[in-house]
């Protein structure tokens, strides 16, 4: 498929997938919430970890209905420079998600 704009979404995400980004600078003021945009089917549980794929979990969101946006409240304010990993899990092995973009505030 061809996508408009400067980026393309990550597609066909299945349970057990992890998508990581190195390195994000949260600055000194930090972030206390995050937002993920895409096509996320109901039943997905998405976790945000920092510093490594099996690092500290800073937030988990359970998607209760098909969503275009998932909002995360971070367990603590994140400051400084960190790698960020989004983990996707669901009990329905047939479900697939699409990850378009994210932001931290």
Residues covered by each model-derived region:
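Extracytoplasmic
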Residues: 1-105
């Amino acid at each position: 498929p061809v996508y408009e704009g400067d980026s393309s979404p990550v597609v066909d995400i299945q349970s057990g997938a992890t998508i990581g980004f190195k390195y994000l600078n949260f600055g000194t003021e930090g972030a206390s919430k995050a937002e993920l945009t895409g096509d996320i089917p109901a039943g997905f549980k998405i976790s945000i970890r920092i510093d490594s794929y099996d690092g500290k979990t800073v937030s988990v969101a359970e998607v209760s209905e098909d969503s275009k946006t998932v909002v995360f409240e971070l367990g603590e304010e994140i400051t400084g420079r960190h790698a960020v990993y989004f983990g996707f899990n669901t009990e329905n092995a047939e479900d697939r998600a699409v990850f378009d973009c994210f932001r931290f505030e």
